[in-house]
């Protein structure tokens, strides 16, 4: 499939000061005009939302984020505040939230660190340090352990080869090494999996996966499932999935956040907010292909109220 891109585009005829006034009016006095807030913010790009925030402060003398926080609540508030947060800072806040307090949201750590580009990871590291006065790596170390910790530390280094270069000999060697590290012996050399999956470029890895299948007579995903377990397994699978088809990986994250009883709203919100401008159309196409139903219909059936309204706009239509 050719990449289709995002659903949220910059609005034409954009006037930040006008939008700021509309938002103030929606929140002033008794009650809140949620529709007015949705109609402005859901139809603006992240960059435009930042301009609105500046215009709001300049022309009204109040902070838009603070006003939204005091007027809105629940999941609707969470989506709107997420949309108002600059992209890298949003990732940083989500990573922090995943590690703060008791318990760890391993899924969130894996999702962000396995799917972002090395350049994005480097920016995440800088912003995390500025925001919290300590490094992302230190927080990962204090919150996770064993091989799972090691794979996250490795991903958080942002050191993956970004070229398209394919060294045929190294590619064959990697495939052979992975085979020997797992399927071929009793016990698993987990570090080998980590080294290859966390440092090689995408083009190289796609060839490694093909060669691996030829040698092992099975997909690398099958081997990862039988050779590793727990969060370490989840992380390796996420890396492979993101290399093969990142939009399909996010489609699966969305599907799992909604299928069955209850909804994992944190994941649903994070993926919808962070992918709306990047590859939401591709995620939708993959969702339909994988699950036979549209993402739109899933969101519609799983959410309600203003929360549902804004998610459906980010989704951008039915398939």
From Swiss-Prot:
Q: Which GO terms describe its cellular component?
A: apical plasma membrane; chromaffin granule membrane; cytoplasm; cytosol; membrane; nucleus; plasma membrane; vesicle membrane
Q: Which cysteines are joined by disulfide bonds?
A: none
Question: Where in this protein does the record say N-acetylalanine is found?
Answer: 2
Spell out which residues are annotated as carrying N6-acetyllysine.
213, 293, 300
Protein's membrane topology: Peripheral membrane protein
Query: Subunit details for this protein?
Result: Monomer. Binds to SFTPA1 in a Ca(2+)-dependent manner.
Q: What is this protein called?
A: Annexin A4
